[in-house]
Amino acid sequence: MLTATAQKKHRVAIDFERPSLGNLDLRCGANLLITLAGKIAKKAIYFLTLWQQFFIAMNGQGKLYFRYGTMGSAKTALLLTQAYNFEERKMQYLCMKPIIDNRENANVIRSRIGIERACSWIYPEMDLYEFLKSEFERTLEVKAWVLVVEAQFRTKEQVDQLARVVDDYGVNVVCYGLRTDFQSHVFEGSLRLFELADTIDEIKSTCSCGRKTIINARIDSNGDVVSDGNQVEIGGDDKYVALCRRCWRARRIESAERNALQFHDSHSE
């Protein structure tokens, strides 16, 4: 038998262990406050991003750049040098390249001289405006510079999306790419960049004859200039050579005559 004092202590212990309705209300209230605080924080981040977007857009500092040149004109090296300078100055930037350029088999941009930087992939059907908007919201900061390599492979719509990023966020978007393909026809992305870019710069390089290169000639395994084929065929020095217009025309004629002679010889035997 418990004494009266022991029974009283036992009842107090039981009451202490048993959660009261008041304690449950406090716990539920705390959980509700935590959930509510999380939602408020998300809204605050969203409106902060919108305010940052509005403030930057009002300043109107962003520009769309198109820097074009033939293959081997150091376009990629210039982009990577620009990225290095941003890092030195603690400036925010983002590098991007098309998934079609899989020569490195990795999400890096690498130049012929060996320097490289990590980058984000650009897929054929990607909405670049929505991607960059999500990237800015995810990192809680608007990148001051977006650097795009192989910009000639972008669609007309994607170039429009990049221009919208410039206008809405005040971001500087710098596109590096080719002007024309191996048949001297302007790429879709390049044409749209010529139409929309605020600043257009030519990166010049020299043909073996001393003139300025303007044609990205495609060559076969024998070094002959190719005149037919798909517009897009990824390759380096083994498939392309930058030529001036005169040398390109001369080599096309030489290649055509040589191929015609070989065809004639093979059928006359």
Give the ranges of each region predicted by the language model.
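Cationic, amphipathic, low-complexity segments that mediate targeting or membrane/lipid association
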Residues: 36-37, 41-44
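Conserved P-loop
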Residues: 59-135, 181-192, 205, 234-264
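Conserved P-loop NTPase "ATPase switch" module shared by AAA+ and STAND
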Residues: 141-154
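Cationic, low-complexity basic patches in intrinsically disordered or flexible, solvent-exposed regions
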Residues: 10, 18, 52-54
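Ser/Thr-rich, low-complexity intrinsically disordered segments
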Residues: 1-14, 38
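Aromatic (phenylalanine/tyrosine) cluster motif
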Residues: 16, 46-47, 54-55
